[in-house]
């Protein structure tokens, strides 16, 4: 079996839609075959695990994936605003701890202690938040009874057992979009933010201390992984967060998102995961303050799940070169045992998705114009039924069409190769 070949994008011509003006056939779907998951820049998490299994240390792992960096302790106790709810119209918050208290304040009160709550939420009650015009409307719900609180642009909620409010250690739940997560630390802010096309939407942030309250809840790799891999991830995650801290983004009311667009923040469930959570917490604690730096400043320590056999540089992926990113061999990403889901993958993309990616009415042909040395697509060109041509960076195409990676080839088209047959069982 071939261990590495930047893999494939196959066009399905089984169903076609004739155009009104010409005989050009418009494919209904595009079948995709490739390798790796994510942008491939920086540390490969699958590669880090493989190196840890082989006995390498966290320092050795990080030094392999990041060029000319220093690993040194920095003060990482700053407070982060982590977005935990984006572009919402409503959300629900409740306390799941007996005798814990929950209080709501009008405004964004920061770290202030000399503030008076506008309401104390009774036990077995919840706080519901709804966008109302350009404001947020909170209501306290107890059983079937709902009491509204005067609207405001932003509210802060605190609960007992945190840095902000003494008392019984509380754990709160936050529910939106049919998903519930639990939070133990910091405080939550609920703000109405104006968007370009949707009007006002609800943005929810969790203000947490980076060094522990935040990092304990980061969920980027399984906590069951080897210690060195967990420590390498803890240092990379700390470094990435340090590079974002204090750079406020109005669109999310945050320093960074709690999703994979920055890095995944699961909250309290990560450190309390049965059987494994304490291992991740230990990895964070045992690497306290350790940060990847150049010239004394934290780097943007990019990482992704896996590559197509070679990692990618930031310049190739996004157009802005970062000297500490480099393309290095990452053959573990192509190991079906270590990377069973993404050593090779197959997807089907709709015509609508591809044409939307290129902002064209339709796409009848795709052509890879150039490839990077890593095997990722540098430029991919689309042609519409009217003959209009547009090009995209390969990483942009990946992001817009939601395929796993930019390591692919075209099949059955202008500069195509034959598809790789599926491995025998």
Locate predicted features.
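Conserved, single-site charged/polar hotspot
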Residues: 2-425
